[in-house]
């Protein structure tokens, strides 16, 4: 896989309400039905924090800004976000990145 400077990386930090991390993770899995159909989405990986079961991280990698925008403005995205609300313990934080180099890219 060739890496271009137009590639967009994103790390999302999702704090779950106390004791709701596993429920948030389960609810989040609904995204994969849609993400698996997105041609410009290279990686979309859900993680649980190794030291805090109520903190989830999502690593996302897109072909370009257009693919990232298409993902975040997709028809399914807003209702999906609302479906996570009962399990959230705070606002998600998003960190946009420009990948430089790495194994697997």
Located regions from the model:
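Glycine-rich beta-strand-turn "strand-cap" elements at beta-sheet edges
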Residues: 1-8, 46-54, 82-105
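Short glycine-rich loop/turn motifs that provide flexible caps or phosphate-binding loops at active sites
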Residues: 8, 18, 39
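Short, well-ordered beta-strand segments in beta-rich or mixed alpha/beta enzyme
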Residues: 8-15, 45-72
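Short, surface-exposed ligand-recognition loops at beta-strand->loop->(often short) alpha-helix junctions
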Residues: 15-24
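An amphipathic, aromatic/His-enriched active-site/gating alpha helix that lines ligand/cofactor pockets
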Residues: 30-42, 61-95
